[in-house]
A protein has these predicted regions:
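N-terminal, active-site-proximal structural segment of metallo-dependent hydrolase catalytic domains
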Residues: 1-99, 136
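Structured beta-strand-rich core segments of catalytic domains in phosphoester-bond hydrolases
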Residues: 63-64, 69-151
Length: 151
């Protein structure tokens, strides 16, 4: 089986959705220079449709917060824009507004979040004790931007 995979870092994608995760297709300026939100949404839809990937890793996807669900927001985007990669999978949520979410075609793939860990490498929703400044004292490091691990 041959798969078509893509990665797309969409600058300011988050700003194209309201707090409930609905697209804001209007004439208000987007955060991109000299382009409206409607123009940016249309352009993104065109690009993603033409890529026509079985799965596309979206970097800087709509964030997930108490008000918004990034997975639902991306699935709405795919539905509105007629993109066959219409189901979304997120891993560990972060609070940096730079989520990584996989959009995929459920007719081709079955995807689930599958984080791994071992004693020397904790899961990315945990913390790591490591001597960062070589002072023989371990500091706790929390991961601010966890990768998305899927299978």
């Amino acid at each position: 089986m041959q798969l078509r995979l893509a990665t797309y870092n969409v600058e300011w994608f988050d700003a194209l959705f309201d707090e409930q995760g609905y697209l804001q297709r209007d004439t208000v300026w987007s955060r991109r220079h000299n382009i409206t939100r409607a123009q940016q949404i249309k352009a993104l839809g065109t690009v993603v449709r033409r890529i026509d990937a079985d799965a596309i890793m979206v970097v800087e996807a709509p964030d997930t917060s108490r008000q918004r669900n990034g997975v639902r927001a991306l699935q709405r985007f795919a539905q509105v824009m007629g993109i066959r990669a219409r189901k979304a999978q997120i891993g560990f949520v972060n609070d940096t507004q730079q989520e990584i979410i996989l959009l995929y075609d459920p007719d081709v793939l079955h995807v689930r979040h599958a984080p791994r860990s071992d004693p020397d490498a904790p899961r990315f929703d945990g913390s790591l004790l490591i001597d960062l400044d070589v002072n023989e004292t371990k500091e706790e490091v929390r991961f601010s931007k966890p990768p998305l691990e899927v299978e």
